[in-house]
Amino acid sequence: MMPLYLLGALAMSLCIAGLIEFQLHNRSLSSIPLRIHVNGTRGKSSVTRLVAAGLREGGLKTFAKTTGTAPRVIDPEGKDRIIHRLRLPSIGEQVRLLRYFASEKPDAVVIECMAVQPQYQWIAEHQMIKSHIGVITNVRPDHLEEMGPTEEDVAYSLCNTIPNEALLITAEDQKPDILKAVAKQNNSQVVCSDPTSVSQKEIDLFTYIEHRSNVAIAIDVCEKAGIDRQTALNGMHKVKPDVGALVVWDLMIKESTYKFVNGMAANDPVSTLGIWNSINDRYGLGKKTCIFFNSREDR
C-alpha cells in the first residue's frame, strides 16, 4: 500500500501540473484577439466555414476548426487539414488546437463546439474558449438522450456555451426567449439573425444549397468583426462546403437525368422536413420522388 506522504506528493504534483496547464492555456487565449464559438443543433460546421471565409476575405488571418461529419482544421488560406485521431474524440482536443492556433499569431479563430453533454458544453465555453462572440445556430430535437428529453431542455443545454459579458448571435426561431434570458444572466448582448435578409440571388451564388439562416448568422458575425456585408459574402461564395452540406447531384441513368439530394447530415425530424420543403420549393417534388432513409443503430 502506498504511504500517505507519497499519495500527498502525487496529489500536489497533479495540482501544480493543472495550475501550470491552466496558466499556459490562458496565455494561449490572450494571444487570439477574436475567438468565435459556434454551437447549435444544425448547421454548426457550415456556419463555422462561412464565418471563417468571410473573415479571411476581410483580411483577417483566420483559423477554423469543424467537428461535424468529418473534423477539419481550416488554415488561413482556406485549405482543409484532416484531423487524424488516435483515440475517441475528446473536448481536450480543443485545448491543444487553441495552443497551436495561438502559436501562429492569428487575428481570429472560429471553432465549432464538439461537446454534447451539458456540463462539457459549459466547460468548452467558460474554461476552454471564453469566446468574444458566441453562436447558437438553432435548437432542434436532437441528442435527446444527452440533452433532453424535451426541446426546451436542449435549448438550456446549448445555452451553456453563451459567453459572459460578450455577444450571442442566433437564428433560433423556436425557443429564442430561453436564449435571451440566459444571455441576460450572463450580461451578454443578443443579435437575432434574420434569414429573410439574405436574397435568393445571394443564395444562388453558392456552389451547393446553403440555408439562409446560416448565411444570415455568418454575415452578422462578420459585420460585428468589422467586415462589411459584401466583402464577407464574396468570401462565403468561395467556401468549400462541409462534407455534410446539402448537395444536389445530377445522375445520368439510361439517358434519363435524376437529381440525388444528399440530406443525410440532417438527423432530426424538423431539419429533415425543412430540407424536404427547401428542395420542393427549388425543384418541385412529384410522384416520382424516392427517399433513401439512413437509420442509425442508436436512433
Feature roles, as predicted:
Residues N26-I32, A53-G134, N138-A155:
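ATP-dependent carboxylate-amine ligase catalytic core
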Residues M264-R299:
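Active-site beta-alpha connecting loops in nucleotide-dependent enzymes
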